[in-house]
């Protein structure tokens, strides 16, 4: 069986999941899905993709823990164009409140956090 370690705002690609199920699954997992990253709403696509959902087995997840897999996601093999991630939705005010709640200094942080984005 396939186990997906993912945030609720990360949507894996059905095509990539079907592909993984069609091959010798145990030979390729864990694998990270590189996803298109949107900020604030679906009009703002970040130019860099997000390595989000991790596809694995229960055995690997028990051996390494979801937290350890997440911390290793940039060192695990990945599939590109594998879904969508939606970060900081709810409008600019909601995002500002989120940053303030986390005590993140927002001055100058917006540019660094959002990086290069395109308005679709």
Residue ranges of predicted features:
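Conserved catalytic core of nucleotide-sugar-dependent glycosyltransferases
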Residues: 10-112
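Active-site-proximal specificity loops/subdomain of glycosyltransferases
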Residues: 1-5, 14
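Charged phosphate-binding loop/patch that engages nucleotide di/tri-phosphates or the phosphate backbone
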Residues: 111-120
